[in-house]
Amino acid sequence: MGDKELMWALKNGDLDEVKNILVKAEDVNRTLEGGRKPLHYAADCGQAEMLEFLLSKGADVNAPDKHGITPLLSATYEGHVTCVKILLEKGADKNRKGPDGLSAFEAAESEAIKALLE
């Protein structure tokens, strides 16, 4: 299964397809096309159930993408409150800064996300 199929399934919340792909010995922490890991795509697209699954399979909660953006920053930038909550509960480093030099709290526009990050 290629990166495009996996990325589509991650972005669209097709958990059954992601499980099917990962059963075939896919590395949950591998870097996909575009320099991001599966967890980044799930966080960026607000796929909370997908995040839970990937984390249960050993996804690195603090893995940076090719730009130095973590899954927590991805979820924060896109305003996905539930994803931010899950990532924090699973040990995401809320003090890591993105390439713009801002932490998740500093980058957050959502008051609900800021409250979680305090």
UniProtKB/Swiss-Prot annotation:
Function, as annotated: Regulates NF-kappa-B transcription factor activity. Promotes growth of cardiomyocytes, but not cardiomyocyte proliferation. Promotes cardiac muscle hypertrophy. Plays a role in the regulation of the growth of actin filaments. Inhibits the activity of the F-actin-capping protein complex.
Gene name for this UniProt entry: mtpn
PANTHER family: ANKYRIN REPEAT DOMAIN-CONTAINING PROTEIN 39-RELATED (PTHR24171), BRCA1-ASSOCIATED RING DOMAIN PROTEIN 1 (PTHR24171:SF8)
Gene Ontology terms: cellular component: cytoplasm; nucleus; perinuclear region of cytoplasm
Record-linked InterPro entries: Ankyrin_rpt, Ankyrin_rpt-contain_sf
Signal sequence segment: none
Keyword Metal-binding: no
Primary localization class, coarse: cytoplasm
Keyword Transferase (UniProt): no
A Pfam cross-reference name: Ank_2
Compartments (UniProt record): Cytoplasm; Nucleus; Cytoplasm, Perinuclear region
Protein name: Myotrophin
GO biological process: regulation of barbed-end actin filament capping
Protein family membership: Belongs to the myotrophin family.
ANK repeat start-end pairs: 1-30, 34-65, 67-98
Keywords assigned by UniProt, alphabetized: ANK repeat, Cytoplasm, Nucleus, Repeat
